[in-house]
Design a protein with these regions (language model features):
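Negatively charged, low-complexity tracts enriched in Asp/Glu with abundant Ser/Thr
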Residues: 1-38, 42
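Arginine residue identity/basic-tract feature
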Residues: 5-7, 21, 37, 45, ...
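Extended aliphatic helical segments
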Residues: 15-18, 32-35, 44, 50, ...
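A short, structured beta-strand/loop element
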Residues: 28-68
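Acidic, low-complexity intrinsically disordered segments
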Residues: 61-102
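Alpha-helical interaction segments
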Residues: 18-19, 37, 51, 80-81, ...
Length: 102
């Protein structure tokens, strides 16, 4: 299903969370933490269920390099809520880890 709903939430100056999801079932989503450095937005962490509605991936990035995902299984709404909560509650640590790996 195409992701036809998008929200951009600015968490702090230069830090944004983008939430994309499909309207129809099965729900497909992507939740991405982005940070702006020197005028360019960089993906720091991404959560999605691109392979299966019940299979959820958390991708770390080392610089621009996407790392192998952490994979969990479960309900879409639970996974989306957990991803949003993880970003909202831990974005500064996630960004700091990404910056240290650059």
């Amino acid at each position: 299903m195409p992701k036809d709903r998008t929200r951009e939430l600015f968490i702090a100056p230069g830090v944004m969370m983008v939430i994309e999801r499909s309207s129809s079932h099965p729900i497909e989503y992507a939740i991405v933490l982005l940070v702006e450095r020197n005028g360019t937005w960089h993906t720091v962490r991404a959560f999605d269920n691109v392979h299966d509605p019940q299979e959820h991936h958390e991708h770390r990035y080392d610089g621009a390099e996407k790392q192998p995902p952490i994979v969990t299984h479960g309900a879409v709404n639970d996974a989306m809520y957990a991803a949003e909560a993880k970003i909202r509650g831990g974005w500064s640590d996630i960004v700091r880890s990404w910056e240290n790996a650059r």
